[in-house]
Swiss-Prot record:
This protein's encoding gene: pepB
Gene3D superfamilies reported in the protein's UniProt record: Zn peptidases (3.40.630.10)
Positions with a binding annotation for Mn(2+) 2: 196, 201, 219, 280
Cofactor: Mn(2+)
Family: Belongs to the peptidase M17 family.
One example of a Gene Ontology biological process annotation: proteolysis
Transmembrane segments: none
Protein name: Peptidase B
Length: 432
């Protein structure tokens, strides 16, 4: 007897005995998702969660009503990091099948690497796994990568990554990956993508409470998301040179760890006083943004699980977007809307740059004053390390990367949200 369940889509309501608001009904031939009027992708994702929650481990999406977007919605809801069920679907056009495969390949990488434990994904492992993923999906010969690690970070001037990670026994690392499909080694760099890669964040000496620390294996979610975004852009045909820079460290407590009052001197000459060791993501990103600026790209994008303030403002369903470039920001928001992903703008203005005073350095790593807008001042801090911060720079504060508990649409863990937005935005900008 087959254990595979067929799942159908219907615009008709369920039979009355299932309840007048029933999303699912069951019969001898399988289950039916009742959408009513329209084609509610959220309802499909919720139904997939219900079926996974019932322990159904093999599903065929059957019937004539399934298309690319509905299959994708079901996949997103059905996927569970604890128990991977098998999912099959009806035949799609060659173009739609290629797109679905590209989405699954890229977002599954993102979700899997974020869900892994900090023991499995130390800083060097994160850099290595990201490079291996991009090499595995890019055309042969288009990707080169180097990983700068340990004391080499100091000799090359990457003081922030080294300082944040020096309290850990696991070596810090910076991935410098070059995707160049042009065949010209002197081709200009179109875009630089910078990811925060804190593989575990204890908070350092500004120690997090235990309940805030439980999800901190996912503090490298910015790196996972931006790597997946580049991967999907490549699978969709990205034809310009892009560099991926991941800033990887583990923020731990030891006799060697970063201390309050320490001062970091960055490669661009800026000095930063450490007033909170739990505001470490911006310290590693600063190195990545300096390196990105050195490449003279048209576009710089950074992704980071940077602040609790963004999550407090937007919850789990949106990433925050901040930029001084209003036109570019609008284009990114449009890309997110087209890809059906949550992205919402938060304010970023010049006065935010003045909210980081230090008595001993150019900047403090946290803002001062009552009711400080934490997400905005974190982005303002980063702006000091982008050469032309007014133009061509976008900052994503990834509030929707990871869920500590399941919801009606998502299993607990990583969501992969943002991968599609980044890919579309990159390819649209590259096509101009």
């Amino acid at each position: 007897m087959s254990t595979q369940m067929s799942v159908f889509l219907s615009q008709e309501p369920a039979a009355p005995h299932w309840g007048d608001k029933a999303l699912l009904s069951f019969a001898e031939n399988g289950a039916t998702i009742h959408l009513g009027d329209g084609h509610d992708l959220g309802a499909i994702q919720r139904a997939a969660r219900q079926l996974d929650g019932q322990g159904i481990r093999s599903i065929l999406l059957a019937g004539d009503n399934w298309d690319l977007e509905s299959i994708w919605a079901f996949h997103q809801g059905y996927r569970n990091p604890k128990k991977h069920g098998t999912l099959e679907w009806v035949a799609l056009s060659e173009q739609d099948q290629a797109e679905l495969h590209a989405r699954i390949t890229s977002t599954d990488f993102t979700r899997d690497i974020i869900n892994k434990t900090a023991e499995e994904v130390a800083p060097r492992q994160l850099a290595t796994m990201a490079a291996e993923f991009i090499k595995s999906i890019a055309p042969q010969g288009t990707v080169t990568a180097r990983i700068v690690k340990d004391k080499d970070l100091l000799s090359e001037g990457w003081e922030g990554i080294y300082a944040v990670g020096r309290g850990s026994e696991r070596t810090s690392a910076m991935l410098q990956l070059d995707y160049n499909p042009t065949g010209d080694e002197n081709a200009p760099v179109f875009a630089c993508l910078v990811g925060k890669g804190i593989t575990f964040d204890s908070g350092g000496y500004s120690l997090k409470p235990s309940n805030f620390m439980t999800a901190m294996k996912a503090d490298m979610g910015g790196s996972g998301t931006i790597t997946g975004g580049l991967g999907l852009a490549i699978l969709r045909g990205l034809n310009k040179r892009v560099k991926l820079i991941l800033c990887c460290a583990e923020n731990m407590v030891s006799g060697r760890a970063l201390k309050l009052g320490d001062i970091i001197t960055y490669k661009n000459g800026k000095t930063v006083e450490i007033m909170n060791t739990d505001a470490e993501g911006r310290l590693v990103l600063a190195d990545g943004l300096i390196y990105a600026s050195e490449q003279n790209p048209e576009l710089i994008i950074d992704c980071a699980t940077l602040t609790g303030a963004a999550k407090n403002a937007l919850g789990n369903d949106y990433h925050a977007l901040m930029s001084f470039d209003d036109e570019l920001s609008h284009q990114a928001l449009t890309a997110a809307n087209q890809e059906k992903e949550g992205l919402w703008p938060l304010p970023l203005a010049d006065f935010h740059r003045g909210m980081l005073p230090s008595n001993f350095a150019d900047l403090s790593n946290i803002s001062s004053g009552d009711y400080s807008p934490g997400a905005s001042t974190a982005a303002a801090f980063l702006s000091y390390f982008v050469e032309d911060y007014k133009k061509g720079w976008l900052h994503f504060d990834c509030a929707g990367t990871y869920r500590k508990s399941a919801s009606d649409k998502w299993a607990a863990g990583a969501t992969g949200m943002g991968v599609r937005t980044l890919a579309r935005f990159l390819n649209e900008q590259a096509a101009k």
